[in-house]
């Protein structure tokens, strides 16, 4: 069999507080009338900077790493250099290691009053399983240590946001992070039972988040399965750990916290057969809801939720699904 390894590379250069420059980055997917040959998709990347001191910054550099598979459009860079406004004095495109190219823009000045914005196109020439986030850094040529870095990525919900790949198997990472996001209003015990019993739902677990392993573009939530409420394809997960994989863009929305318990269910299509058991994708068909512990259940604001969970659990374990 094929050995599947998931590498957990942490983003080392976290966004540090920027003291000398204000920096923002905006990425949008665009449709060009005449895209260059071989381009599968095009984005516009706009970086805006302002100097935070009370004078303009003199010669400054904007250093842009490209998202995997993307290359900058030189025509749009030439226009920035040669236009009436002459936004940049020159640029350099460097092909980096492992196909992460970088683009260096030289600016004669960065104003301390107005933002200086540079906007150019980048084309996707080859598709990768997962587009890695990239970064934009601005610094003064003479004091390169005082730099400001921001990470950027294709916009939420973009088809380019792409897929989670392990080896040669890819799955879409939906922009819908988990199921309850699509429900408005109060969620009752009956609703939960009906949804957990819907066709396609494979398993229902109570699980504890024991470890979070972040990587460049997705998070691996290591969960210990406390209780199998409804048995699924994964034959004997109780008291064992399982990996639940989610797109990094969903981290805030999921807001999962270590050592908390969760009610989880998901569909068969989100199970991933691996040599040592199954991994699970967290996506728009995954229910992921905080399950308060005994102490938290005694707090008044959690009592209804805890009662609901007992009802759901008893119903599914004792009565089972109606279908």
Swiss-Prot record:
Pfam families: A2M_recep, NTR. GO terms for cellular component: extracellular region. This is Complement C3. It is found in: Secreted. InterPro entries: A-macroglobulin_rcpt-bd, A-macroglobulin_rcpt-bd_sf, A2M/Complement_sys, Netrin_domain, Netrin_module_non-TIMP, NTR_complement_C3, TIMP-like_OB-fold. Its main location: secreted. Disulfide bonds join 177-250, 197-321. Keywords: Complement alternate pathway, Complement pathway, Disulfide bond, Immunity, Inflammatory response, Innate immunity, Secreted. It comes from Xenopus laevis (African clawed frog). The gene is c3. SMART domains: A2M_recep, C345C. It comes from the Eukaryota.
